[in-house]
């Protein structure tokens, strides 16, 4: 248990940041899932629209430190490759 006032404040800040990070990570998962569902259904237009929305969300999460930059790049790359196969 935190004893000093600064430690108590730090605990509150950590809880706030954790909630923000959890929300951002959840948003990323939602956007990625929407792309994957559109790819699975074979709807090219919906998949492209979902991908355009998901890519900046992934990169924003990487910028904010929620996920690693390489992880975000890998996810974007793999989704783009699957979208390219669908388009071909």
Swiss-Prot record:
Provide one Gene Ontology cellular component.
small ribosomal subunit
Q: Where is this region: Disordered?
A: 1-23
The disulfide bridges present are none
Q: Does the keyword Transmembrane helix apply?
A: no
Annotated Gene Ontology MF terms?
A: small ribosomal subunit rRNA binding; structural constituent of ribosome
Entry keyword Ribonucleoprotein: yes
Which Pfam families does the entry mention? Ribosomal_S20p
| Entry keywords, A to Z | Ribonucleoprotein, Ribosomal protein, RNA-binding, rRNA-binding
Q: List the GO biological process terms.
A: translation
PANTHER family referenced in this protein's UniProt entry, alphabetically: 30S RIBOSOMAL PROTEIN S20, SMALL RIBOSOMAL SUBUNIT PROTEIN BS20C
Q: Which family does it belong to?
A: Belongs to the bacterial ribosomal protein bS20 family.
Function according to Swiss-Prot or TrEMBL: Binds directly to 16S ribosomal RNA.
Name of the protein in its database record: Small ribosomal subunit protein bS20
């Amino acid at each position: 248990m935190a004893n000093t006032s600064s430690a108590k404040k730090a605990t509150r800040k950590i809880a706030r940041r954790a909630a923000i990070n959890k929300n951002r990570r959840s948003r990323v998962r939602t956007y990625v899932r929407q792309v994957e569902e559109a790819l699975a259904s074979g709807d090219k237009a919906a998949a492209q629209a979902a991908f355009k929305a998901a890519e900046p969300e992934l990169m924003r999460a990487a910028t904010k430190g929620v996920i690693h930059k390489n992880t975000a790049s890998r996810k974007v790359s793999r989704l783009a490759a699957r979208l390219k196969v669908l388009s071909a």
